[in-house]
Amino acid sequence: MPKVEIYTWRFCPFCIRAKQLLDRKGVTYTEYVIDGDEDARDAMVARGSDGKRSVPQIFIDGAHVGGCDDLYALERQGRLDPLLAVAS
């Protein structure tokens, strides 16, 4: 079963929007709230595939999905549900 992880800041509107999509789909995820924690942000960047320091950053089964726009793009393309099917 894939593990869904999301790195966020508490009041980030893009983080809230990404979590809303996952919540609507009934996905259980691990959230890492990294407000102001540069060590945690560096760890997030090291895991990612594109070096982005922005939040949110989303991982499904260890694979870097990207940010909020990337998550919604997968949804529009019909590619998100297959990724989440075994995670739900």
Predicted regions, residues:
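Structural micro-motif
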Residues: S49-F59, C68-D69
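Non-catalytic, surface beta->alpha helical segment in thiol-disulfide oxidoreductase systems
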Residues: I60-A87
